[in-house]
Amino acid sequence: MRDKVDRPGVPRRRVDAGTIASYGLIAGAVVLGWQIAIQPLMQRAPVEAAIRLAPGSPLVLRRSAESELAAGRVENAAALSRDALARSPFDVRALRVLGLTEARAGREDEADEILTLAGNWSLRDDPAHAWLVERRLRRGDYASAFAHADTLVRRRQDIQPQVFRLFTVAGTEDPQRSLPVTASLLAARPPWRGAYLSSLSQTPQELQLAASLAVLLESGRAPLNNGELQGLYWTLLRKDQIQALSMVRERINRPPIGEAVTNGGFADAAAPEPFQWRLFQKAGIVAEIVTDDLRSANPALRVDYDGYAAGTVAEQLTTLPPGAHRFTAEVRIETGDPAARLAWTLSCAAGGGALASLPAGPSNATPDGWRTFSGRFEVPNNCPAQWLRLETRAKDRRAPTVVWFDRVAISPAN
């Protein structure tokens, strides 16, 4: 009997841990690649295609919920938004859809809670903030409604007209409750502040609202700057709202109401127009505020006039009370006869002829140092604001005149 010879067996391939890991990495990479590949499809493909591609994706569920809500299928939208939130609890858009479905179903208190949460989570969720604006306005809660409106208008200039109209209508119809809220928003100096203030420029109601806001802001942390106040003053003046203009200046005291002539010494250019000197330049007329070459560090108004051109040299608005007043100023002549070629005039801002016209210096004066001249005039009862002007008295021949003015003032005659 022959001995059996053991034949060696076929060696088994041993799978080590490294090979298993590499297989796992490959599988993971395939899955990850698939997820990356379908992301654009889930975001941009038609909802019907996206839901077949990734039915469990929170993104797709949320898109489907939005689509159902837009189509008016409220129950489907509510169910899909809840499914999306179950998979992605912080999906603001899904939360907003759920809130809007509650509102469509008549459960506005529940909708208010949900959409408030959505609005707090994201300042960019415009539909949530828009719904909250409307809801809070119906409840008379201006503070909350305007806060959400502020959130909207900070981001989107295209809706400024609608939001501004909201502020304006509320301020016109319910000023006692809404104006302090609007003023509080403006006091934070939002990026839309200038645009809103500029929009209040057409109707008498808008102008009255602008005046009221100026007074409210003056007592707060962010009063109108000189540019904003100057814009308001000019708008009121051009719209013939003289009483409102006088009221605003008196209430906010800018420039100080006690000074009949603002910057009469020509040293303070900070006051807003039209209660500030406005100088005019044209051929034959040069007016500038420069340092006096006789009195060191003293600015004054220097006028170089050819005696032939006609026009206004300088002007500012005043609000003198009715009665008798005295005009005084200092003058220094370099050349010519300013009394014959220039005059200080006062006229009503609402129209009409000059109330007074005073020669701009002593008659037949010779070049010399500074001297004072004065004149008296009356302001009637129906003239709440006046233009103080330095004007030319042109003649048919040129007569060069160079003259300085300083310390221009108006005081009660008595």
Describe the residue ranges of each PLM region.
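Residue at a conserved register position within TPR or TPR-like alpha-solenoid repeats
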Residues: E68, E102, R136, F167-G171, ...
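Alpha-helical segment of the N-proximal tetratricopeptide repeat
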Residues: L32-L80, F90
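Alpha-solenoid helical repeat scaffolds
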Residues: R62-R63, R93-V97, E113, D126-E134, ...
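Extracellular and organelle-lumenal recognition/adhesion modules and their flexible linkers in secreted
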Residues: G9, R13-R44, D158, A183-N414
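Alpha-helical repeat scaffolds
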Residues: P46-I51, N76-R82, D109-L117, A143-L152, ...
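Structural marker of alpha-solenoid helical repeat scaffolds
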Residues: L53, R87, W121, R155-R156, ...
